[in-house]
Amino acid sequence: MQTTAQKRELAEKQEKGLSVKSILIVAVLIAAGAVLKIFSNTIFSFTPLKPNMVIAMYCLAIMLLRPRVVEAAVIGLISGIICMFLPGATPYANIVSELVGAVVICLLAKLPYRLEVKGLSFKVAIDTFLATLCSGYTFFLMLKVLILTGMELSGMAIDVFTAVIFGTAAINSVIAFLLYPVLKKVLVRE
């Protein structure tokens, strides 16, 4: 049985933040997302809008590691800064949109709902989809504020943005759905 002092020591250890191992996991996943984003940018080079796979990777990192909201916000800020240096970036828009997306996925991860079909959990896919939508629409809002201020956007332009945002959300949710169980098993083994 644990004494009160041992419980207090355990609580203090838990409040210190992400471990070095967790930070390395976040770094590797965000780097993989950056590579996927560069790769997808070459595939979609003919379009003005491109999907962002960094979102899927920070969603995976946050769902796997369950950081506090502040730590998730830092993960989002770092992801946004990295996105700014990738080809085809819109200055500053990614910083805000990835911050929002990371905080949203962190809050969604804390919700106690479960959605399973024949033993397969769809929570990660749904949470990633919703976080990507929040990030995408925040990016769109930032784009409107930073670049398109005063410009009238046609219905078709908004439809294109919406299609890219929902398409990216679908791709990211599939990536998260497929990789989450594998990564979770690897992390549990260690």
Model-predicted regions and their roles:
Residues 37-50, 78-109:
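Interfacial aromatic-anchored transmembrane helix boundaries in multi-pass membrane proteins
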Residues 92, 117-190:
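Membrane-embedded alpha-helical hairpins and interfacial helices in multi-pass inner-membrane proteins
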Residues 51-61, 91-94, 130-134:
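Alpha-helical transmembrane segments of integral membrane proteins, especially early/N-terminal helices
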Residues 2-65:
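Hydrophobic transmembrane alpha-helices
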Residues 61-75:
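Membrane-helix interface "capping/anchor" motifs
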Residues 2-14, 22-28, 35, 75, ...:
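Short helix-perturbing small/polar motifs within transmembrane alpha-helices
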Residues 40-45, 65-67, 86-91, 113, ...:
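Short helix-capping/hinge motifs at transmembrane helix termini and TM-loop junctions
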Residues 29-33, 71-83:
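Small-polar-interrupted transmembrane alpha-helices in polytopic inner-membrane proteins
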